[in-house]
Amino acid sequence: MAGGQLNVLSTLDQAKTQWYHFMAIVIAGMGFFTDAYDLFCISLVTKLLGRIYYTDDSKDTPGALPPNVSAAVTGVALCGTLAGQLFFGWLGDKLGRKSVYGFTLILMVVCSVASGLSFGSSAKGVVSTLCFFRFWLGFGIGGDYPLSATIMSEYANKRTRGAFIAAVFAMQGFGILFGAIVALAVSAGFRHAYPAPSYSDNHAASLVPQADYVWRIILMFGTVPAALTYYWRMKMPETARYTALIARNAKQAAADMSKVLHTQIEESADRAETVAVGGESWGLFSRQFLRRHGLHLLATTSTWFLLDIAFYSQNLFQKDIFSKVGWIPPAKTMNALEELYRIARAQALIALCGTIPGYWFTVAFIEIMGRFWIQIMGFAMMTAFMLGLAIPYHHWTTPGHHTGFIVMYGFTFFFANFGPNSTTFIVPAEIYPARLRSTCHGISAAAGKAGAIIGAFGFLYAAQDQHKPEPGYPRGIGIKNALFVLAGTNFLGTIMTLLVPESKGMSLEVISQEVADGDDEEAAYPK
């Protein structure tokens, strides 16, 4: 876009924080609340699924999902998410943010319910049906990443834009916590109604038939808050930046935002016509794109990829780490529902003490410290805490030192969320031109999910004991060495962050070089 900025976009940039900003945070944030609930609640119920469908009463230990089944159940939604991020990111730039936004929510709600209703006459049938619906659930979740980030970015003023996008993403923390709370409540209720002995006391009686309802209720419950926001999601007008810069209808954008901001915004016919005919048209991966944004795309994809290797390998399999350090007793000493209860309690404590505070520290400090320095700090601190876990690992696993391990582990999550887990979501929504913003955010997010898949699938095998792996698994490098690998991954993330531009306090059109602004242009690059 040549020349200065449109009146409607300038008005949005300068707007005071008001009610519609908070409505946008809630509407977009509840999608992320559901995303996190749906993605992470599966880690709560995999042990229960193993007991229900793969228990052999003649063995001394409860049933567990075979390695290939466990990998499929935990990872298939991530595969769907990757595909959804690419597809809906592209579609959001082609059809508009709003028109695609409602469809992703419907897909999430339907597939979440269907996951809980998975059927089959055998264990294989149930798991296959579950994986099918969780893939498409992930596909819908994937669409929420680029669309929610882009919508919030394009609605916000430039002074608090980072905090608003971070607040949307921070709803993930509440989604993870809510999943743990639901699992705690459901398992506690069923334990009270259907008491059972431990597996070691009575193999068959330790698993009550009603346990099959428990995992289904947990998987389906996340649809409730998402469904409640559908009406408001559909009432949101299309973003002014899409309407003005992509649909080339600046007058309509001004009219839409006049209603939202409760102020009269005038857009001259001459200025609107200039935008309609004068916008740049170079496409994704063109020479002009690579010259302006090639390093930016390398930065946002690589840092998100590296972050998610570490983040998802910890988060999806933290229950196994808790078992090693003694927070969750051996499975045979518990019945099925008690094991679920203890896993959920551990996840709730980590979410409450490490995950959620980190997200909201980002909200509080991102407009003070900036995106670049928060991301550098987060990766560096994650590296340090991972090394602090790995180097004296045997010390942490000896009796009397388990609490120290949990504290260190919690700080790792804190600095992931007060760090790259938040900023890798925020930056791609700010630094690309409007016509490619959703697409590039989707590409960056998909790179992250590729890292998550490596973390989720790879950690199952890599963290196995070098001498006594779990049944069905080959020997791995052990948790200690896996923690060293994750520390190295985080250090690489620190290095790649040097390519990330700073976008604090700047108009989206200045950051993406769609308008010239000599005063702000230098700020697009970290000092």
From Swiss-Prot:
Annotated keywords: Membrane, Phosphate transport, Symport, Transmembrane, Transmembrane helix, Transport
Cross-referenced Pfam families: Sugar_tr (PF00083)
Single Gene Ontology BP term? phosphate ion transport
Q: Major location, coarse class?
A: membrane
Return one GO MF term: phosphate transmembrane transporter activity
| Top-level taxon of the source organism | Eukaryota
Q: Which tissue types show expression of this protein?
A: Expressed in roots, stems and leaves.
Question: Which family does the similarity line name?
Answer: Belongs to the major facilitator superfamily. Phosphate:H(+) symporter (TC 2.A.1.9) family.
Annotated source species = Oryza sativa subsp. japonica (Rice)
Protein task: High-affinity transporter for external inorganic phosphate. Required for phosphate acquisition in plant.
Q: Which InterPro entries match?
A: MFS_dom (IPR020846), MFS_sugar_transport-like (IPR005828), MFS_trans_sf (IPR036259), Phos_permease (IPR004738)
Indicate what this protein is called per its UniProt record: Inorganic phosphate transporter 1-1
Could you tell me which cysteines form disulfide bridges?
Answer: none
Transmembrane segments annotated in the record for this chain: 22-42, 71-91, 100-120, 125-145, 164-184, 212-232, 293-313, 349-369, 372-392, 406-426, 443-463, 482-502
Q: How does it sit in the membrane?
A: Multi-pass membrane protein
Any further remarks? Plants overexpressing PHT1-1 accumulates almost twice the amount of phosphate in the shoots compared to the wild-type plants. Although related to the sugar transporter family, it does not transport sugars.
Query: Which compartments does it reside in?
Result: Membrane
PROSITE patterns recorded for this chain? Answer: MFS
